[in-house]
UniProtKB/Swiss-Prot annotation:
Signal peptide: none annotated. Might take part in the signal recognition particle (SRP) pathway. This is inferred from the conservation of its genetic proximity to ftsY/ffh. May be a regulatory protein. It comes from the Bacteria. It holds the Pfam family UPF0122. This is UPF0122 protein LSL_0628. Belongs to the UPF0122 family. Transmembrane segments: none annotated. The lineage of its organism: Bacteria, Bacillati, Bacillota, Bacilli, Lactobacillales. It comes from Ligilactobacillus salivarius (strain UCC118). InterPro entries: RNA_pol_sigma_r3/r4-like (IPR013324), UPF0122 (IPR007394), UPF0122_fam_protein (IPR054831), WH-like_DNA-bd_sf (IPR036388). HAMAP family: UPF0122.
């Protein structure tokens, strides 16, 4: 499993988790966040590996569909990038303005 895919699914899961069913949340959470294998999940929930695999793949598609319509993750990335650019600019050009730096740092902490 590629690290980029894992990171993306985890990020999408963070944004869209409340829109998933309890089973989808459980399987995706165990597989991507907790690094369980398909076999471990199947054993814990007394279902086949194929059932777990199918559920996870369907849920990945659902998460991608939500993102294609709502763009929450993309917008978060763009806002983060712009905030980083703003902070860099202020540090380079207005380093003496402690109030401005403080306010930007507060904005950054709101993202977390």
């Amino acid at each position: 499993m590629a690290i980029e895919k894992t990171n993306r699914i985890n990020a999408l899961f963070d944004f869209y988790e409340p829109l998933l069913t309890p089973k989808q949340m459980t399987y995706i959470g165990l597989y991507y966040r907790d690094d369980y294998s398909l076999g471990e999940i199947a054993e814990n929930y007394e279902v086949s590996r194929q059932a777990v695999y199918d559920n996870i793949r369907r849920t990945e598609k659902i998460l991608e569909e939500y993102e294609s319509k709502l763009h929450l993750y993309r917008n978060f990335q763009l806002q983060s990038e712009e905030l980083d650019n703003l902070l860099k600019y202020v540090e380079e050009n207005y380093a003496y303005d402690k109030e401005l730096l403080t306010r930007i740092n507060r904005l950054e902490s709101l993202e977390e």
